[in-house]
Amino acid sequence: MFSHIERHSECVAGMAEALARRAVETGATRHPELVALSLAAGLLHDIAKSYTVQFGGSHAQIGASWVVDSTGNHKVAQAVYHHVEWPWPLPEDLVHPVFFVIYADKRARHDEMVSLDERYEDLLVRYGKSEHSRAAIHRGWEHSKTIERVLSAQLEFPLHESTVVGGRLVSRA
């Protein structure tokens, strides 16, 4: 794995773990194992990225396959597979490693947590070369804002103002 992808994955894992920890602390879930699952999924979400840069393919699909093959853990693999895009309507309850990793990945610009607006502005500059790509980036931005709004309510914390310090969500303000 390229070192910059490893640093990015550690950043995503920290946020995903903090979201899961918050869910346990607030009673949004009665499944404390979500903390370890979210940490693992965050660390592994881009496990195949270096491979696909060199050889092609979907890093999410290949990575999920590797996770199932090496760990047998389908919950972690599901988060790896869907971290790029959740193609269905959102369920009411987003307290799950899939949504923790999706959200954390969308907040992580390289190896730092930034707001969704900052992250998507960066994506537009770097990848918004055509009307089609700009439209896709905008759809992802809107989807991520919905996830942020729902998770903020479910975790009773204003995520748009948050970062992670010492494994805990804290306000950036």
For every predicted segment, state its role:
Residues M1-R30, L44, G72-H74, E85-A173:
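Divalent metal-dependent phosphate-bond-processing catalytic cores, especially two-metal-ion Mg2+/Mn2+ enzymes
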Residues V12, H31-V67, A79-P87:
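His-Asp-centered metal-binding catalytic motifs of divalent-metal-dependent phosphohydrolases/nucleases
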